[in-house]
């Protein structure tokens, strides 16, 4: 599809995104040039400059702008900068305030041998104490010097302490020196020590429930506020079109709220965003203080790059912006996430992008010590990890929705109903986010939502055929800017358009309205009458500038949306070409049958392959039948135990093969598994044999898996395990010798697992023989190196990790251990000295001295089989789902209480009979919901459930069931009919009313969802029919036998859903799971449910019996 792109529109490809950034950089340079050219700040008109950003600008001005941003030659006053030649520490540049801050004098030309003064060419180590000089020597040759930051140094002349923050640039090593103040937290050095300050904040972020990016953003601004103490902390997100929005905020109560504000892309220039990617935390202590000039060696060919410096001075344009906001100091942290659509030249794999910023403002000067800033930076890395997961999950949900909608739309086409994609539900509006959609086919229009008139759609189609005749469609966020001549007639209701050509003259259209309706001025009311100085760079002015920029423009079409439209277009073009072919349907069904036969062959092949995989798996796998006798014994478990497959077959696992101490555990696990309850992380001890004689023991951690027959009955148990014999023996010996670990760590025993350790500053202190063998790095080569940064890292390290996310996760594990928290098994993947991929599970534990003080961390590795890793992933996923479900259940109880209170109040008012009946129906629906919230799904599936028996009228049940289906039926245009005798409604019965309601409501919903006819002249319908017979028991009780027939129009539910209903499926859809549970509930109430045909129509047939609430002698049966 062709695509028209403008400022503030979504790129349809990587190239358009890259081009948009280049264009935005030009707009930034234009704004910068306008500011520089103004003789005084009052002559700078901000809002006019934003508009003027659309005009062209020379490449020389853009280059000058970028040069000024990165090589401005100015630094802030809260520290001093010294740049040196790395090998010799010869000074190449320094800030004009450095001599005073270091308490040394300057000397233009040093005398022979005298370098105790600061000047170009001096050895910077002569200005520092001997210990400080040694600390600087330590970093020479280290690839990632940031892991050593901050290094604590002292001035030789005065003893004044400083944090030295190091980075490299194009000329050498840059040292930012920040004075350590008396009230600063005591941090002696290294990133690991700084990260401890964020331990509580990190724990909170990791404990948050998934699926709520808003809560995540709210939490991170609260934690940063607590760490830094700034008056205002905001989370600022960049949208696809480069403009920004404040999505979370915490502030001092007397400050104006900025939550919900949108800002033009020029407010945070592209050059500044690039700098944030390189230097992820930026502090401005006092925007009113003049910057300090940088003095540099005249032999340097250009001004020195300050991209990575913590002291780089802000541009005057930005300081004025801050002053206008009454923000004297600021702290800004970059939030960087993965970017699968990274389009930068030379990027072939997944890149990274700037998702947004966490911005702190203060109304007075404020300094935040570097260790706290480092902790904040680490917190941002954890925040980015969480964001990656949330964005990924949201994308998956969205893609699944699109695929499901596409499938349903294609299903309509297979049933020869092409017009159904606009006349039925779901329809084409459900495919992507839009305000309206239309099908233009055969010179007729079908309209959905907010659209142009039929005449206007015909005109748009003609314009496309005339002006874009060579393309298969068009997408734009502004019809006016695309050149459509009648765009002004459409108004704000229709601004954006995505069009897909499906035949030579026919189109599908999706429409979007004006962006401004999506933009809200949050917090304080934005009064249109309130006028501020539009020429000043103030948030309100910025907001007005944004509204002007997005005039006659919609939200951009995202790449995933255009992919979905294009996919549907390809399907429809083929379908519409074949629409008159009478053999099309026959051909389709024949192809489907071929696919089914092919699927059976593939299933057989997969089954054979699974058997082979189990036999050759690197994990020990064994299986038993219903009597606990071995019927599966793979090669790995035979190797570990010394017992061959033939010898093990038929032996009793509990009585003959496990060690005596594991016998009770195995018997219990077998009993539970045969009852259908699977266990995880069970430790069992198997006997080992040497030529069939018992020799020793092998320790396995196993997960059990029930083996079932075609009827879903448990017929055996499979054990998938991991050999932890070596690790277990090591841990036991650690306990026995109470800390005398050297004999174990440095042992050559092959049973000892790989072990490495670090001191409290993050330097490697242990690297045992097994770790040498695993990594191919000798102990003496790694001891004393920084564990993360020199040994494990991304570039020029001993053991390369896969991406920044893995580095961050490893740092989290080590940080938890140093803070005394035991870590779970962390899947660690790295590449050894020879480039071989190593997969292992890491357990990190604190290391303490004799007084119990934490002195470092110990890490145990054991190589993990794919089977165990998969089991661990599945377990964590299940735990996460269970946690989220518990949260939802708990949160639903509160609004339920509110509904109950409202109902109670209404019951005490003067109501008509009909109104009272509605209140009663509401009460029973509420009771049903409470029952569902209290359900334990596992208990229901296993047949354990307490029924709440009480008297009820069948009429109340019918009313409650129909009320639950009315909204869905009206939305889908389905008519609900009933055939229920009046005497049935008046029957007073004894049973569980809420459960009966739940079952019938689920079946009714399913019937409504599938009540679709292919004949447009027929109305879709669902019929509820109830019949009964009566039996008298010996004790005078009458038993009523009921048949509920819920029939519906259409071809019926799918075979897959029928399989889910009868528990024959291995995977459940939400609808299938609900129906399956309802069938289980009916059987637990001694009833039955079938899906059958009644008088030519598909229907659910429910048979169940209830006693009448009164005997013949009028005595209650309760």
From Swiss-Prot:
<dbReference type="InterPro" id="IPR001294">
    <property type="entry name" value="Phytochrome"/>
</dbReference>
<dbReference type="InterPro" id="IPR043150">
    <property type="entry name" value="Phytochrome_PHY_sf"/>
</dbReference>
<feature type="binding site" description="covalent">
    <location>
        <position position="317"/>
    </location>
    <ligand>
        <name>phytochromobilin</name>
    </ligand>
</feature>
<dbReference type="Pfam" id="PF00360">
    <property type="entry name" value="PHY"/>
</dbReference>
<feature type="domain" description="GAF">
    <location>
        <begin position="212"/>
        <end position="391"/>
    </location>
</feature>
<dbReference type="GO" id="GO:0009881">
    <property type="term" value="F:photoreceptor activity"/>
</dbReference>
<feature type="region of interest" description="Disordered">
    <location>
        <begin position="1"/>
        <end position="23"/>
    </location>
</feature>
<feature type="domain" description="PAS 1">
    <location>
        <begin position="606"/>
        <end position="677"/>
    </location>
</feature>
<dbReference type="GO" id="GO:0009584">
    <property type="term" value="P:detection of visible light"/>
</dbReference>
<dbReference type="InterPro" id="IPR036890">
    <property type="entry name" value="HATPase_C_sf"/>
</dbReference>
<dbReference type="InterPro" id="IPR013767">
    <property type="entry name" value="PAS_fold"/>
</dbReference>
<dbReference type="InterPro" id="IPR029016">
    <property type="entry name" value="GAF-like_dom_sf"/>
</dbReference>
<dbReference type="InterPro" id="IPR013654">
    <property type="entry name" value="PAS_2"/>
</dbReference>
<dbReference type="GO" id="GO:0042803">
    <property type="term" value="F:protein homodimerization activity"/>
</dbReference>
<dbReference type="InterPro" id="IPR016132">
    <property type="entry name" value="Phyto_chromo_attachment"/>
</dbReference>
<dbReference type="InterPro" id="IPR000014">
    <property type="entry name" value="PAS"/>
</dbReference>
<dbReference type="InterPro" id="IPR035965">
    <property type="entry name" value="PAS-like_dom_sf"/>
</dbReference>
<keyword id="KW-0600">Photoreceptor protein</keyword>
<dbReference type="Pfam" id="PF00989">
    <property type="entry name" value="PAS"/>
</dbReference>
<dbReference type="InterPro" id="IPR044767">
    <property type="entry name" value="Phy_HATPase-like"/>
</dbReference>
<keyword id="KW-0805">Transcription regulation</keyword>
<keyword id="KW-0675">Receptor</keyword>
<dbReference type="Pfam" id="PF01590">
    <property type="entry name" value="GAF"/>
</dbReference>
<comment type="subunit">
    <text>Homodimer.</text>
</comment>
<dbReference type="Pfam" id="PF08446">
    <property type="entry name" value="PAS_2"/>
</dbReference>
<dbReference type="InterPro" id="IPR005467">
    <property type="entry name" value="His_kinase_dom"/>
</dbReference>
<dbReference type="InterPro" id="IPR013516">
    <property type="entry name" value="Phyto_chromo_BS"/>
</dbReference>
<dbReference type="GO" id="GO:0009585">
    <property type="term" value="P:red, far-red light phototransduction"/>
</dbReference>
<feature type="domain" description="PAS 2">
    <location>
        <begin position="740"/>
        <end position="811"/>
    </location>
</feature>
<feature type="domain" description="Histidine kinase">
    <location>
        <begin position="887"/>
        <end position="1110"/>
    </location>
</feature>
<dbReference type="InterPro" id="IPR003018">
    <property type="entry name" value="GAF"/>
</dbReference>
<dbReference type="InterPro" id="IPR012129">
    <property type="entry name" value="Phytochrome_A-E"/>
</dbReference>
<keyword id="KW-0716">Sensory transduction</keyword>
<comment type="function">
    <text>Regulatory photoreceptor which exists in two forms that are reversibly interconvertible by light: the Pr form that absorbs maximally in the red region of the spectrum and the Pfr form that absorbs maximally in the far-red region. Photoconversion of Pr to Pfr induces an array of morphogenic responses, whereas reconversion of Pfr to Pr cancels the induction of those responses. Pfr controls the expression of a number of nuclear genes including those encoding the small subunit of ribulose-bisphosphate carboxylase, chlorophyll A/B binding protein, protochlorophyllide reductase, rRNA, etc.</text>
</comment>
<dbReference type="GO" id="GO:0006355">
    <property type="term" value="P:regulation of DNA-templated transcription"/>
</dbReference>
<keyword id="KW-0677">Repeat</keyword>
<dbReference type="InterPro" id="IPR013515">
    <property type="entry name" value="Phytochrome_cen-reg"/>
</dbReference>
<comment type="similarity">
    <text>Belongs to the phytochrome family.</text>
</comment>
<protein>
    <recommendedName>
        <fullName>Phytochrome 1</fullName>
    </recommendedName>
</protein>
<keyword id="KW-0157">Chromophore</keyword>
<dbReference type="Pfam" id="PF02518">
    <property type="entry name" value="HATPase_c"/>
</dbReference>
<feature type="compositionally biased region" description="Low complexity">
    <location>
        <begin position="1"/>
        <end position="10"/>
    </location>
</feature>
């Amino acid at each position: 599809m062709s695509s028209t792109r403008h400022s503030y529109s979504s790129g349809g490809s990587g190239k358009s995104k890259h081009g948009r950034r280049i264009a935005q950089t030009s707009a930034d340079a234009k704004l910068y040039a306008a500011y520089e050219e103004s003789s005084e700040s009052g002559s700078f008109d901000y809002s006019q400059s934003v508009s003027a950003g659309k005009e062209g600008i020379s490449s020389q001005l853009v280059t000058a702008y970028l040069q000024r941003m990165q090589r401005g030659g100015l630094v802030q006053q809260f520290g001093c900068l010294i740049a040196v030649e790395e090998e010799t520490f010869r000074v190449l540049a320094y800030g004009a305030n450095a001599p005073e801050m270091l308490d040394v004098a300057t000397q233009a030309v040093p005398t022979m041998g005298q370098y105790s003064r600061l000047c170009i060419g001096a050895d910077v180590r002569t200005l520092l104490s001997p210990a400080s000089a040694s600390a600087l020597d330590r970093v020479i040759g280290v690839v990632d010097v940031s892991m050593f930051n901050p290094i604590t140094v002292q001035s030789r002349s005065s003893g004044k302490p400083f944090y030295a923050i190091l980075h490299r640039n194009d000329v050498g090593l840059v040292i930012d020196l920040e004075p350590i103040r008396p009230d600063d937290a005591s941090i002696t050095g290294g990133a690991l020590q700084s990260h401890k300050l964020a331990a509580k904040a990190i724990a909170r972020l990791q404990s948050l429930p998934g699926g709520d990016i808003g809560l995540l953003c709210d939490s991170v601004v609260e934690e940063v506020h607590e760490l830094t103490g700034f008056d205002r902390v905001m989370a600022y997100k960049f949208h696809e079109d480069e403009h920004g929005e404040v999505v979370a905020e915490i502030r001092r109560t007397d400050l104006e709220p900025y939550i919900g504000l949108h800002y033009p892309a020029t407010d945070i220039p592209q050059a500044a965003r690039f700098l944030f990617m390189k230097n992820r935390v930026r502090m401005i202590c006092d925007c009113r203080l003049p910057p300090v000039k940088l003095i540099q060696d005249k032999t340097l060919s250009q001004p020195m790059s300050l991209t990575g410096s913590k002291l780089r001075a802000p541009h005057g344009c930005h300081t004025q912006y801050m002053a206008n906001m009454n923000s004297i100091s600021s702290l800004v942290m970059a939030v960087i996430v993965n970017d699968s659509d990274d389009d930068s030249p030379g990027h072939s794999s997944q890149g990274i992008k700037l998702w947004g910023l966490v911005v702190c403002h203060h109304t007075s000067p404020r300094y935040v010590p570097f260790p706290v800033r480092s902790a904040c930076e680490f917190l941002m890395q954890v925040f980015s990890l969480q964001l990656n997961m949330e964005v990924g999950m949201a994308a998956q949900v969205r893609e699944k929705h699109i695929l499901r909608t596409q499938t349903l739309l294609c299903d309509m086409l297979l049933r020869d109903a092409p017009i159904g994609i606009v006349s039925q539900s779901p329809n084409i509006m459900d495919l992507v986010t839009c305000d309206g959609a239309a099908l233009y086919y055969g010179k007729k229009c079908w309209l959905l939502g907010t659209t142009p008139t039929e005449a206007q759609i015909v005109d748009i189609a003609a314009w496309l055929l005339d002006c874009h005749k060579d393309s298969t469609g068009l997408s734009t966020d502004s019809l006016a800017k695309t050149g459509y001549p009648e765009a002004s007639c459409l108004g704000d209701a229709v601004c954006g358009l995505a069009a897909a050509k499906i035949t030579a003259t026919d189109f599908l259209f999706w429409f979007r309205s004006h962006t401004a309706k999506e933009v809200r001025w949050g917090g304080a009311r934005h009064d249109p009458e309130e006028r501020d100085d539009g020429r000043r760079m103030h948030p309100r002015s910025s907001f007005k500038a944004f509204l002007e920029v997005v005039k006659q423009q919609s939200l951009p079409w995202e790449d995933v949306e255009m992919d979905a439209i294009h996919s549907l277009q390809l399907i429809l073009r083929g379908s519409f070409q074949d629409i008159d072919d009478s053999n099309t349907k026959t051909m389709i069904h024949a192809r489907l049958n071929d696919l089914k036969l092919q699927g059976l062959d593939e299933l057989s092949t997969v089954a054979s392959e699974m058997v082979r995989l189990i036999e050759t798996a690197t994990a020990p796998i064994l299986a038993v039948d219903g009597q606990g006798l071995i019927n599966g014994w793979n090669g790995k478990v035979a190797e570990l135990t010394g017992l061959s497959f033939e010898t093990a077959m038929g032996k009793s696992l509990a009585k003959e093969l496990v060690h005596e101490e594991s016998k009770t555990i195995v018997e219990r696990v077998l009993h539970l598994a045969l009852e259908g309850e699977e266990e995880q992380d069970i430790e069992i001890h198997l006997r080992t044999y040497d030529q069939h004689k018992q020799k020793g023991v092998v320790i396995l951690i196993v997960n059990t898996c029930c083996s079932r027959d075609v009827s879903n009955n448990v017929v055996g148990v499979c054990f998938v395990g991991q050999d932890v014999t070596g690790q277990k023996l090591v841990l036991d010996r650690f306990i026995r010798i109470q800390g005398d670990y050297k004999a174990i760590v440095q042992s050559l025993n092959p049973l000892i697992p790989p072990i490495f350790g670090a001191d409290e500053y993050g330097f490697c202190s242990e690297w045992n023989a097994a770790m040498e063998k695993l990594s191919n790095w000798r102990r003496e080569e790694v001891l004393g190196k920084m564990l993360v940064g020199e040994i494990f890292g991304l570039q020029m390290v001993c053991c390369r990790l896969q991406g920044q996310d893995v580095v961050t996760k490893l740092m989290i594990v080590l940080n938890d251990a140093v803070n005394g928290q035991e870590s779970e098994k962390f899947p660690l993947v790295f590449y050894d000295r020879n480039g071989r991929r190593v997969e292992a599970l890491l357990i990190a534990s604190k290391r303490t001295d004799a007084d119990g003080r934490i002195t470092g961390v110990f890490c145990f590795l054991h190589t993990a089989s794919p089977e165990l890793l998969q089991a661990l992933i599945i377990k964590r996923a299940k735990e996460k789902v269970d946690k989220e479900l518990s949260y939802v259940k708990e949160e639903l109880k509160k609004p339920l209480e509110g509904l109950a209170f409202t109902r109670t109040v209404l019951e005490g008012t003067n109501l008509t009979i009909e109104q009272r009946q509605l209140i009663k129906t509401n009460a029973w629906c509420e009771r049903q919901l409470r029952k569902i919230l209290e359900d334990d799904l596992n208990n229901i599936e296993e047949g354990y459930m307490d029924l709440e028996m009480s008297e009820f009228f069948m009429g109340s049940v019918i009313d409650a069931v129909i009320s639950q289906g009315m909204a869905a039926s009206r939305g889908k245009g389905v008519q609900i009919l009933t055939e229920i005798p009046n005497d049935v409604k008046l029957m007073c019965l004894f049973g569980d009313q809420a459960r009966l309601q739940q079952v019938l409501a689920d079946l009714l919903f399913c019937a409504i969802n599938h009540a679709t006819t292919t004949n447009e002249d027929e109305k879709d319908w669902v019929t509820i029919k109830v019949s009964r017979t009566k039996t008298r028991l010996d004790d005078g009780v009458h038993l009523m036998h009921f048949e509920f027939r819920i029939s519906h129009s259409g071809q019926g539910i799918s075979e897959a859903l029928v399989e889910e209903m009868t528990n024959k499926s291995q995977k459940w859809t939400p609808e299938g799971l609900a129906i399956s549970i309802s069938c289980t509930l009916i059987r637990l109430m001694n009833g039955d449910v079938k899906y059958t045909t009644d008088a030519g129509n598909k229907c659910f047939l429910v048979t169940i019996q209830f006693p009448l609430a009164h005997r013949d002698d009028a005595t209650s049966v309760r």
